[in-house]
Amino acid sequence: MTDSLPFQLPRRPSVTLLRQGDGGRPARPAPNQPMAGFESRFTDIVNYIVRITDEIWAERAVGYIYDTYDANCTIYSSYGTVRSVEEVIASTVATLNAYPDGELQHLNVAWSGDEQAGFYTSHLGHSRSTNVGRTPWGPGTGRRTSIRFVADCISHNNRIHTEWLVRDNGAAVRQLGQDIHAVAQGIAATIQIETRLVSPEPRLQGQTLRARLELDETSVEGWARALFHDVWNLRRLDWLKSRYADDVLAHAGGGRAAHGLRNYQALVLHVLAAIPDGTMRVEHVSWSEEADGVVVAVRWLLEGRSAPGGVLGECPPGKPVFMMGMSHLRLAAGKVVEEWMLFDELGVLAQTYR
């Protein structure tokens, strides 16, 4: 499976494969990864993430959050920062009240780390539900929603202490029949306790144009960082053909999809058009070896100034914004054949109205 990869994978313990389970449930192998400090029932870090997610969200064990999140946990999103387990519980209760019949599908959990240093996981999931109760955007609508999310977490001794969360709220708002710009203006009018300051980086470094990074592209992290820099910072979309399959399938924020390399390039341009002076920064890289190929997970940040005409629509121009994103890239025959590119355009759009 790994012979044709453009990078080398280091040896590490085998873990649960999500796409080999019965009826969408992950297989439960014999314990195969050291998990000191975690409950003995968890066989590996993927098993831990999937099971606590199912128990909290599907089985309604909301109070189990006290056992799996640190009391002073920090959760980052496009809307601000949460710094308390009580806020996590309050948000979970409100979401379950708004979407009481939610169904979860676990698409991938990339990971890194170990029991001593702690584990980093990037959990890509798909949620289907009916909006019955009030959401932050208004009363229940009775409409169905189908959205993806990614939660990147750092866990140690059975508790998550840091998380970065991206939920496709752009798709959710549209599926609920609401105007995304009106919703964004409402969010912008609310008071935030903690906001992120954005100072866009200049595109030029003095009189010197941006150059390729000197990286070891035989490593997973080096390969991913070089890819994102070449495409998003150097804007060399023509180089995609050496890394992406001609029939690549992409799923992006806002419920967007692209099939084929040409359409994938158009998708990237649509994102860049919204932040045309944007600078891409890769913040973390992890990976998983699934039944249908290796998946590389990248947490990234795109910072710059807003412009109308891209994924943000007719937004106020020239506003400093940041787009927090997570991408999961599945490889086969040495190239990317499928990508999940998650970002929350609603959260970015709200920044343009502040």
Predicted regions and their residues:
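C-terminal and inter-domain tail/linker signature
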Residues: 2-354
